[in-house]
């Protein structure tokens, strides 16, 4: 159940709340707790943290995972302890949470304008690298910092974008003009170049990868066009130039195209760090990222210019691997259904949906809990939603007490995984969800379509996977913690405690 930090909750261990379970942590059987309930598997979480850290070490790049996925300082700390260089965030409020939590370095993938906010970003204690994408932005930020009498310059990254993309300078020339404006500002210091390839396409076939690679080469053009002397003030303060890109879908391509520039020792030029910002990997999911992660595309750390395991000739359509799931609810790429080149890239991440199965390169291994490929790397889904059947008004329909107030629906509906009967001796109900799928969500209800002959009853528990963890986690102030997936346990989980989020 979701709770509001401004609304006190009843002190009962029948729900996960700050007043109840969170204040007196002790193991509680999940079947004794109120639904809906979001759980996070700590074993899977630690697996994902360690896996991504190991992959980055092998690839020879740094990682500043996007903290907006979880907004949970406890999880950020796990990532930092595993070797993350910093944490990426999207808003000044999120940066304030990170500063309070002691995060040493933050990439602010956005821009602030209020003088007091900018002064706080520039304050000692946490190194904040804020994005700027236009000369006008630089002018406004510079003037605001002057009014605020900030005690030190604010480090900024020039954001490079793309026509029809999201934010970011639309050409190399525009980006270079932004860099010149930063260099001329007494209140800013140029720290590097940033971009986000995931705003351009969601396709993982050869055409989609070509769009991503061309964009990433543009980032290199911006970095080279700026030239080493422009970074001297930043370098002289003991920092390294930052070249950053990479969400959770194309981080392999970032390494392939940009990886050779990672040179924190300065052996080939100015000290430079290539920093990935992938965030969703830490939670992973049962649908969207399960299909699109590079680890499902038979790709591992790749040297610059490598193919990353993409087969341009053969593709196969894949689903979720579980009966009746929402795996075929895909996002489209470009609005016309085709990629026509760099300038024809889609307007945004998941801008529209297609009913066709998504095409991924042959050689993938999307089945299994982590979509594990032959690289030996895999992510595991950490999140599960538990809901009760509250109505069986028709033979082929069950209503669950979970809705869009509790879970995401922007990139697919929850995925039915398993059913349990809390009051029965043999609680597991094999087969009752065969062929089932969630067809829609209201605020507090999910429409579960199933075989009219299914034995699912009112009062049964349904275990659901999620698609797109970011927009599920943000609905929960407390997430119940368990260990070991239900698939491996064979018994209902025991809730050990909870993780607090700071949305």
Region roles according to the model:
Residues 1-120, 311-314, 338, 343-344, ...:
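A charged N-terminal "starter" segment
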Residues 162-319, 330, 338, 342, ...:
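Active-site loop/helix belt of alpha/beta enzymes
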Residues 283-302, 370-424:
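Internal helical hairpin/lid segments
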Residues 307-316, 320, 338, 342, ...:
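C-terminal accessory subdomain/extension
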């Amino acid at each position: 159940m979701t709770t509001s930090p401004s609304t006190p909750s009843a002190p009962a261990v029948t729900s996960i709340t700050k007043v109840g379970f969170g204040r007196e942590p002790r193991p509680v059987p999940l079947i004794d707790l109120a639904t809906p309930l979001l759980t996070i598997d700590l074993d899977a979480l630690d697996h994902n943290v360690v896996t991504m850290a190991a992959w980055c070490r092998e690839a020879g790049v740094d990682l500043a995972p996007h903290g907006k996925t979880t907004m949970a300082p406890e999880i950020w700390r796990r990532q930092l302890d595993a070797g993350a260089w910093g944490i990426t965030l999207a808003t000044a409020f999120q940066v304030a949470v990170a500063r309070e939590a002691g995060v040493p370095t933050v990439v602010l993938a956005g821009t602030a304008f209020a003088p007091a906010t900018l002064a706080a970003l520039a304050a000692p204690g946490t190194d904040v690298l804020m994005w700027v994408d236009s000369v006008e932005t630089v002018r406004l930020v510079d003037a605001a910092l002057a009014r605020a009498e900030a005690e030190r310059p604010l480090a900024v990254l020039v954001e490079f974008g793309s026509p029809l993309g999201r934010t970011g300078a639309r050409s190399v020339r525009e980006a270079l003009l932004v860099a010149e404006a930063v260099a001329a500002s007494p209140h800013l210091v140029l720290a590097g170049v940033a971009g986000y390839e995931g705003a351009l396409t969601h396709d993982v076939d050869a055409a989609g990868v070509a769009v991503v690679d061309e964009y990433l080469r543009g980032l290199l053009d911006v970095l080279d066009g700026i030239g080493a002397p422009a970074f001297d003030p930043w370098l002289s303060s003991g920092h390294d130039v930052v070249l950053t890109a990479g969400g959770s879908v194309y981080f392999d391509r970032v390494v392939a195209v940009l990886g050779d520039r990672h040179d924190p020792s300065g052996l080939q030029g100015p000290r430079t760090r290539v920093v990935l910002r992938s965030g969703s990997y830490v939670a992973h999911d049962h649908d969207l990222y399960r299909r699109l992660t590079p680890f499902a595309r038979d790709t591992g750390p790749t040297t610059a210019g490598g193919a990353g395991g993409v087969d341009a000739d053969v593709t196969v359509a894949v689903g979720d691997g579980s009966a009746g799931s929402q795996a075929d609810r895909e996002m489209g790429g470009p609005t016309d259904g085709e990629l026509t080149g760099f300038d024809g890239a889609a307007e945004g991440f998941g801008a529209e949906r297609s009913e066709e199965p998504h095409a991924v390169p042959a050689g993938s291994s999307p089945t299994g809990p982590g979509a594990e490929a032959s690289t030996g790397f895999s992510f595991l889904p950490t999140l599960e939603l538990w809901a009760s059947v509250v109505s069986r008004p028709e033979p082929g329909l069950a209503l669950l007490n979970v809705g869009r107030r509790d879970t995401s629906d922007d990139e697919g509906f929850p995925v039915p995984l398993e059913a349990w009967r809390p009051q029965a001796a043999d609680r597991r109900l094999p087969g009752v969800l065969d062929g089932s799928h969630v067809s829609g969500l209201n605020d507090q209800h999910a429409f579960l379509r199933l075989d009219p002959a299914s034995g699912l009853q009112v009062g049964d528990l349904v275990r659901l996977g999620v698609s797109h963890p970011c927009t599920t986690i943000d609905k929960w102030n407390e997430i119940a913690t368990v260990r070991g997936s239900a698939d491996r346990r064979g018994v209902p989980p025991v809730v050990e405690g909870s993780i607090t989020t700071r949305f």
